Design a protein with these regions (language model features):
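A detector for short, charged/polar N-terminal pre-domain segments
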Residues: 75-76
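Core segments of cupin and vicinal oxygen chelate
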Residues: 2, 11-61
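Vicinal oxygen chelate
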Residues: 1, 10, 33, 41-46, ...
């Protein structure tokens, strides 16, 4: 029986830039940063509040899992923002929004009230977008 999700993958155009974004901008912690045989870099990070869920920052280049044509298509989709969405939760969205903006994080939407809480939208350096969300009392009353 499956017990939990241990890793998820986010495809990135440049692992060094992704390291800077997720660690230095978002404040995630590095779990693993290792170079394997053949030069493949295994880079995982996690949020401080959820260290047992690792995010693998996966390069898009060709290799054992994909050919050059597939790699090129994957890169194009990422750059258009068509892949890699997720929800990042915070207790104080307005404070976090201002802190991240001051660090140079690009937002496409400022904090906005929604039925599920307050949400702002941000992108990483590759083009992957995320919802930064704060739950509210109203968000506990979901529409049916």
């Amino acid at each position: 029986m499956i017990q939990r999700i241990s890793h998820i993958t986010i495809y990135v155009l440049d692992q060094d830039a992704a390291f800077d974004f997720y660690v230095n901008k978002l404040g995630f912690e590095v779990n693993t940063d290792a170079t394997m045989d053949g030069g493949f870099r295994w880079l995982t990070v996690s949020s401080k509040g959820q260290p047992d869920l690792e995010i693998a920052l996966m390069p898009t280049g060709p290799g054992p899992m994909r050919d050059q044509e597939t790699s090129d298509m994957l890169r194009a989709l990422i750059q258009k923002g068509a892949l890699g969405s997720g929800v990042l939760e915070t207790a104080d969205i307005h404070k976090t929004y201002e802190e991240l903006k001051a660090k140079g994080v690009e937002f496409s939407q400022p904090p906005t009230e929604r039925f599920y809480g307050i949400e702002a939208l941000l992108k990483d350096y590759s083009g992957n977008w995320f919802s930064l969300t704060q739950r509210t009392e109203a968000s506990a009353k979901k529409p049916k």
